[in-house]
Amino acid sequence: MFSQTEDGQNTLTHIWDYREKLPNTPYTISGHSRAAERTSFYVPELGILFDAGISTYHSPKIVLITHCHSDHCCMLPMVITNWKSSEPFRVIVPFSQKTMFNKYLNSSFQLFTENSHVSVTGCNIEGWEPNMEYNFGKNILIKTYKCDHSVGCLAYGIIEQRNKLKDEYRTFSGKDIALLRKDGVSITNEIYLKQFVYIGDTSIKIFENYPELFEYQAIIVECTYLRNCDEEFAPMHKHIHWKQLVQYIVKYPEVHFMLIHFSMRYKNEEVIDFFNEKRSQLGISNFSPWLN
């Protein structure tokens, strides 16, 4: 499962080769995340890259950047350089950081070319505000949430729009349904399924501010600190400690919590042992650490 060096830390060689099903959803996910090191995840079924702290050979349809800290965005110029489509490359960032991201990308491409007059082309930087919904493709909505971090930061909810047959037509045969459709009868209702939400750097306050987050099938969320002795650092740096998060994991057993962004002070083996112990103590299994 892991690509590791002898000391138990990961190399970057096979990060994108390993893929796992995101529980409770129809999607799979690959990527890597460690606090103050690098974070990036890719969902191939949607063509969405979340954050760009790692270069990738994938050609995503859209990149959703949570915030401007370098471990979440430093490899964005390389991601753009590797873009293989003729379609404009879409990069979403917090609205307050749009101008700075444009400057960063232009400066990067000027360094690549040793030409101070060039600017990045074929790339659309879009600044999104929190608490908004944006259409993506035919049946996906992306909803933004405001994280509580030291800089402007967005979480991204993935919502799937489906058509569900109205109750009064459930007993109808396929032939009768086809005839109704031909006659222009509206036989379905639109429903919206909250598939998963990707929460980058934040304090625990995001769950207090947005109770609707627990309506998602899966929550990808940072859990930077684990040890009791590290508890003070969570509010200090606006991150999350396990002791703050566990109450919600227990309260919402139908939601799967994928935990990311562990501090580099913890080796993989320590993280695995920690959560194995917690599973045994709590008697629940609706959470998993991501350590690829």
Tell me the role of every PLM-derived stretch:
Residues 52-96:
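Active-site metal-binding motif and surrounding structural segment of the metallo-beta-lactamase
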Residues 60-67, 123-125, 141-143, 280, ...:
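Active-site regions of enzymes building and remodeling cell-envelope glycoconjugates
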Residues 2-61, 154-158, 164, 188-199, ...:
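Conserved beta-strand hairpin/beta-sheet module of binuclear metal-dependent hydrolase folds
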Residues 90, 115-135, 206-292:
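Binuclear metal-ion centers of metallo-dependent hydrolases, dominated by the metallo-beta-lactamase
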Residues 50-53, 66, 199-200, 221-223, ...:
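Active-site flanking residues adjacent to catalytic metal/cofactor-binding acidic residues
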Residues 1-20, 25-39, 128-132, 142, ...:
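Extended recognition/assembly regions associated with phosphoester-bond processing machinery
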Residues 135-228:
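Active-site-proximal loop/helix segment associated with metal-binding centers of metalloenzymes
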